[in-house]
From Swiss-Prot:
One of the protein's GO biological processes: amino acid biosynthetic process
Cofactors: FMNH2
UniProt record similarity statement: Belongs to the chorismate synthase family.
Pathway per the UniProt entry: Metabolic intermediate biosynthesis; chorismate biosynthesis; chorismate from D-erythrose 4-phosphate and phosphoenolpyruvate: step 7/7
Origin species: Chlorobium phaeovibrioides (strain DSM 265 / 1930)
Function comment: This reaction introduces a second double bond into the aromatic ring system.
Annotated Pfam families: Chorismate_synt
Protein name (Swiss-Prot/TrEMBL): Chorismate synthase
Length: 397
């Protein structure tokens, strides 16, 4: 079972991650990890921090000669901006007397609840750990599980279907054609857009909307569509609540900063339709197996993978740090004041799509481990291939 922990503050020396449970024998490269980190930094509407950081992962353990060795993998991502924060974020030398305390909580952030929960007299520690900067470590960790899945024929990708008022409906035929080649192909097509949208007109409108929001000192959220192809039927389980694949995927995506809603397939649209227009019919195709003319279940039926593309939609709220501040109050004086602005993005929806790809990878990998077990890539691959062949043969007629 893959599990990982991250550590580090947004303006501290570095972010780090420890990944446990990766099987031995998985070919990995620093270039692939860094590619995912670069993808996370992309997107129109990002703030000044992205001009400072050039994220790259340093591997400290768990990999030898380009392959995993089954032991915990430790990764470090240095924060270049640390040199500007050595006094404010010093670990041991005390600069408390000369460091300005942050006492005005920003609406929509972790500031107020975090300050009350942990008893700080300064909101800075809350700001720095709750920051979405932490997702760089999750992307690095997730890239390892993603690489493992790719070597088993399972791919993950995402696109952005809306930013603010702009919706990219996308051509179903275009999306289907890309997914036929694998979700990585769809991700590559999305990456060619500054906002990771597939439609050119939608891309132009989204960029204009981001520009307008920035001009007004405002921010924009949006909707992310995540796709996972090549997943065999039967991952997850209906037997216990904590083994349900859909709940595990939803939890992983909901744990991304600013994500406020998740659905599997067009779930909320399905809720407004009769069952006859929602459920996917089953067709037995001789020599091929079971096919569904639609995939409104989002690739999960009865909390298990159906064998179709897994489709997850996530709603990201607008970023809470705005240059046109909302009403707040000062914790030191208890007087009403306008909220303070912390350097931030106008829109980070495209980057959040990359983070979503990363966090679902360990979930699918763990569902594979639960089904097939194994400590080495080849052991798992052989068991998976045997299972796939058995499923195909059962319906070949």
């Amino acid at each position: 079972m893959i599990r990982y922990f991250t550590a580090g503050e947004s303006h501290g020396p570095a972010l780090s991650a420890i990944i446990e449970g990766m099987p031995a024998g998985v070919a990995v490269s620093r270039e692939e990890i860094d590619l995912q980190l670069r993808r996370r930094q992309q997107g129109y509407g990002r703030g000044g921090r992205m001009k400072i950081e050039q994220d790259s992962a340093e591997v400290l353990s768990g990999i030898r000669f380009g392959k995993t060795i089954g032991s915990p993998i430790a990764l470090v991502i240095r924060n270049r901006d640390w040199e500007n924060w050595t006094d404010k974020m010093a670990q041991f030398e005390s600069h408390e007397a000369t460091t300005e305390k942050i006492t005005i909580p920003r609406p929509g952030h972790a500031d107020l609840a975090g300050r009350i929960k942990y008893g700080f007299n300064d909101i800075r520690p809350v700001i720095d750990r709750s920051s979405a900067r932490e997702t760089a470590a999750r992307v690095a960790a997730g890239s390892l599980a993603r690489t493992f899945l790719c070597q088993l024929g399972i791919e993950i990708g995402s696109r952005i279907s809306s930013i603010g008022p702009v919706t990219d409906t996308g051509s179903d035929k275009t999306i289907s054609a890309l997914l036929e080649k694998g979700a990585e192909c769809l991700a590559g097509a999305a990456d060619r857009s500054e906002v990771r949208m597939l439609g050119k007109k939608a891309e132009e409108d989204a960029i204009a909307a981001i520009d307008l929001a920035k001009e007004r000192g405002d921010t924009l959220g949006g909707i992310i569509e995540i796709y996972i192809t090549g997943v065999p039927v039967g991952l997850g389980s209906y037997v216990q609540h904590d083994r349900r694949l859909d709940s595990q995927l939803a939890a992983a995506v909901m744990a991304i900063q600013a994500i406020k809603g998740v659905e599997i397939g067009p779930a909320f649209e399905n809720a407004r339709k009769p069952g006859s227009e929602v459920h996917d019919a089953l067709h037995l195709v001789k020599g091929e197996g079971v096919e569904r003319p639609t995939n409104r279940s989002g690739g999960i039926e009865g909390s298990m993978s159906s064998g179709e593309t897994i489709h997850i939609r996530a709603a990201m709220k607008p970023i809470s740090s705005m240059q046109s501040p909302l009403q707040s109050f000062d914790l030191a004086t208890l007087q009403p004041v306008l909220s303070r602005f912390e350097r931030s993005d106008t829109c980070a929806v495209p980057a959040a799509g990359v983070v979503a790809e990363a966090v679902v990878a360990p979930v699918i990998a763990n569902a594979l481990f639960e089904k097939f077990g194994g400590d080495h890539l080849e052991e798992i691959r052989n068991r998976l291939n045997h299972y796939r062949e058995a499923v195909r043969s059962a319906f070949s007629g």
